[in-house]
Amino acid sequence: IVAAHDIPYAATASIAYIEDFIAKVKRASEVDGPSYIHVIAPCPTGWGIPVDETINAAKKMVDCGLWYLAEYYDGEFHLNRDPKEFTDVSEYLRCQTRFAHLTDEDIEHIVEGRDAKWAKIRREWI
């Protein structure tokens, strides 16, 4: 949505990939005009994970492909991380109490959605 307004800089980031996050904050601070960074930072209480698993949960989300690391600048999207293979989505989901109700069929549907999203990203951004 932010990119649709053609702002000078937008990005997605994760607390699990801190070097990437820092680089994006630096780039955003150097842009003339508005910038936006959407950061995934798990909430232990809301997600139903132990506090000491926060970074690991954020890493699993990126590694299983449910969150991507990208930037938008000069009117184009740029993928910062394009994994050849994804880790198991069910491992990411099942470690959180908020997803305890999901069936195997539900998770398969999520995987199908992830695969469709990544096919579009790779087709249009790379």
Model-derived regions, located:
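Short, structured secondary-structure boundary patches
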Residues: A28-Y36, A57-K60
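Conserved thiamine diphosphate
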Residues: I1-V31
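Short, conserved beta-strand edge motifs with alternating hydrophobic and charged residues
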Residues: A10-A13, Y36-I40
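Glycine-rich beta-alpha junction loops
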Residues: Y17, I40-T45
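Flexible, low-complexity linker and terminal segments
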Residues: C43-I126
